[in-house]
Amino acid sequence: MSKIKRPICWEDVTTPSRLISDRKTVSASDIKQFGMNFDPQPYHLDRDAAKTSIFGGLCASGWHVCAIMMRLLSDKLTSEGIQFIGNDEIPKLKWIEPVFEDDSVYAEIQLKEKQRDPSNVDFGIISADIAVKNQRESDVMVLSAELLVKARQHHDA
């Protein structure tokens, strides 16, 4: 059983720093279920149709990869004790390679710099670059995000 870490608020997060998430293996069932519910393209639903697609095989929706990244990010920040609230904005998002069935992905999180949230005294913003990588260490998706983290102390807006 892992020890619960003390809460880390925005003021206490060290930047720059690098975090690595756990891995998530993406099954054919995961891909098809997400595809049926949210992105019903043939290459997300049918293995045979996917073979003749531009991707050449059953692959996850880019939005599915985003959802996986969000879970990996949230779990990692929470496990570190960081009081993560969510994302303020995502100014950059790029899909690079497909995530195929049975690929194992993880997130490499670079916490770059901190700034006060001018619109809310309860939060601070941490700029982050996140790369989702597969088991071959290839980037499958990269993004820049502004993470909202609970602030310990109120500050002047």
Role assignments for model-derived ranges:
Residues 20, 28, 33, 41, ...:
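A broad, structure-centric signal for solvent-exposed, well-ordered loop/edge residues
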Residues 2-60, 151:
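Catalytic strand-loop segment that frames the active site of acyl-thioester-processing enzymes
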Residues 57-60, 67-112:
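Hydrophobic beta-strand-centered segment that forms part of the acyl-chain substrate-binding groove
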Residues 15-17, 22, 30, 41, ...:
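A generic structural signal for short beta-strands and their flanking turns/coil linkers
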Residues 1-14, 98-157:
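HotDog/MaoC-like acyl-thioester-processing domains
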